[in-house]
């Protein structure tokens, strides 16, 4: 398993959130999640301007094995999507924490970030899943 970046926060459902310098939040799925799904073949992105709610489905990733909702770790408005994933969904498999980001949210309430798991807690969750 790859190293979990220290600047990310996580949902228990394996989505990550990274607060950018402008206060917006970039969202993707964890390296663990992409590994469970296998080779991704399709990503259904939210629309720019869509309102997303914390814990609700905002996107869908599909692999040859399964389709999985991508839940938003924060509430707000989608301000950017990674349209490159339409042509190359496997980017998530190759770089889940970098080029494989899925969408960016203008967050409504920064306090929501405090409810997310930090990298150590997320690593602990993964260890518990393995037992």
Curated annotation (Swiss-Prot):
GO cellular component: cytosol; glycine cleavage complex
Entry-linked Pfam families: GCV_H (PF01597)
Start and end residues of each Lipoyl-binding domain: 24-106
Cofactor(s) required, per the database record: (R)-lipoate
Matches recorded under InterPro entries: 2-oxoA_DH_lipoyl-BS, Biotin_lipoyl, GCV_H, GCV_H/Fam206, GCV_H_sub, Single_hybrid_motif
Cofactor: how bound: Binds 1 lipoyl cofactor covalently.
A biological process term (GO) from this entry: glycine decarboxylation via glycine cleavage system
Keyword Transport on entry: no
Keyword terms, alphabetized: Lipoyl
Keyword Cytoplasm appears in the UniProt entry: no
Domain of life: Bacteria
Modified residue annotations for N6-lipoyllysine: 65
Quaternary data: The glycine cleavage system is composed of four proteins: P, T, L and H.
Family: Belongs to the GcvH family.
General function of this protein: The glycine cleavage system catalyzes the degradation of glycine. The H protein shuttles the methylamine group of glycine from the P protein to the T protein.
PANTHER family assigned to the protein according to its UniProt record, in alphabetical order: GLYCINE CLEAVAGE SYSTEM H PROTEIN, GLYCINE CLEAVAGE SYSTEM H PROTEIN-RELATED
Protein name, per record: Glycine cleavage system H protein
Taxonomic source organism: Xanthomonas euvesicatoria pv. vesicatoria (strain 85-10)
């Amino acid at each position: 398993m790859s190293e979990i970046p220290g600047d990310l926060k996580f949902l228990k459902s394996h989505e990550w959130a990274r607060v950018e310098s402008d206060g917006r939040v970039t969202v993707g799925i964890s390296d663990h999640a992409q590994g469970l799904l296998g080779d991704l073949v399709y990503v259904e992105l939210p629309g720019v301007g869509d309102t997303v709610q914390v814990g609700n489905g905002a996107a869908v990733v599909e692999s040859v094995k399964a389709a999985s909702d991508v839940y938003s770790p924060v509430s707000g408005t989608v301000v950017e999507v990674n349209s490159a994933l339409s042509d190359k969904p496997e980017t998530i498999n190759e770089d889940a924490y970098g080029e494989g980001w899925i969408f960016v949210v203008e967050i409504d309430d920064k306090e929501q970030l405090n409810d997310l798991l930090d990298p150590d807690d997320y690593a602990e969750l993964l260890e518990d899943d393995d037992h």
